[in-house]
Amino acid sequence: MKRGGKREGAGRKQIHGKEYRIKIEDEIINLLNANFHGTTINDKIRGSITLGLETLLQSNKEWNKQYTVLDLFSGAGGLSRGFMDAGYNVVLGVDFDEMALKTFEANHGSAKSMKLDLFDHENINQIEQYLNERNIELDVLVGGPPCQGFSLAGPREANDERNTLYTAMVKVAERLKPKAVILENVPGLLKLYEGKGAQRIVEDFENIGYKIKPEILYAPEFGIPQIRKRVFFVALLESEEYFKFPDPVLFPHEFITCEDAISDLPALEGILGEEIQEYPMPPQTPYQELMRKNADKLYNHIGTIHSEKTVKLISMVPEGKNFKALPEEYSSQFKYNEALTRYHSKKPSLTINTGHRSHFHYEHNRIPTVRESARLQSFPDDFIFYGNKTQQYKQVGNAVPPMLGYHIALQLKNYLTKEHKHETIQYS
């Protein structure tokens, strides 16, 4: 073959929709030509090249595989929605809140839901039976056991049964052997009972063959317009290494603000609004574009009509301040530190909670709507919440921000695909 001559298709391979070209030096080509029928160096070279390409193809295939996910204590399914958005196949959500499960099923593709009391470990049999009947091999188990028992925010007792609800996840992991387990909770868990609570979780998973490590993630660093910290325990089955948590994607000066997140939504000052609404304007920021990507109508954006007294009090609170900014005749009525807190338009919001009476819109004299709270939690607008307003606020506040789940899910794929790197790949 002449130098520079055209070889049809030589060194090219289509991989995941892209064309890759490998340069093969003429000396190697000559060796291949001279020994084409032998079993000498040409076979080794051809084999190495083909093996490399097939390994890359296999890697792409495994990266794009829809790993199965089971969500325990799912609530509305914020954590598993993040996994779904990262290309995973969410197959089942389990919780005891019937309306939250209705929301879960409506927003997780073909996933089903199951109402079970997970404090009763006998109910785990139903989960196992459901998966076995459908020949579903579980890849990933995720869950956020109720945090009230662990949280530093409320009364805690060592014998609070909610402190042990995480053991349902241990039992499911022991029975179904998922490749990875992600357990989410409040950061205070790491300090609870002088760290003994967290240590027990680690030991329980280690005893059934998992390498487990906790880490606190700060939501604004991952593109979520909300000051929220959560601890994640990530356990890898029969792994020699700990999970490396994803690196932050934003610096403080880049954090998404309240205004970035919700300024395109109807004002609803003094009115309730409709169940289904049109957007009043195009997206104003990249974050709004992302939230509206798959939505053409607006849901869960119903306002609240406050009393004249409440509106008067709210109107006197500047951006980013709370009741302490009021004249003493009013401020003395409040004791709770976050009472009458107004969001700041140029900062992320405070932590969204299950209540909805303490925080107020940065501009309008009302509490945020369910949709505004959902935006601040990184729920996209096509994620529709069911139930009455109180139930919807609870679902939003209890959830893990989907975007946090998304970043963990992408990072986890690096570990799930490693299982295949030592497999024998046939080539000819």
What are these regions (language model features)?
Residues 1-29, 33-36:
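Short Lys/Arg-rich basic patches
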Residues 35, 152-156, 389:
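Short acidic, glycine/proline-rich loop/turn micro-motifs
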Residues 61-177, 187-191, 196-198:
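Core alpha/beta nucleotide-donor-binding catalytic domains of modification enzymes
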Residues 129-135, 153-330:
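Class I S-adenosyl-L-methionine
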Residues 282-428:
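C-terminal target-recognition/interaction regions appended to catalytic cores
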Residues 24, 217, 262, 352-353, ...:
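Bulky hydrophobic/aromatic "packing anchor" residues in well-ordered structure
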Residues 37-60:
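Short, basic amphipathic alpha-helical segments that act as recognition/interaction helices
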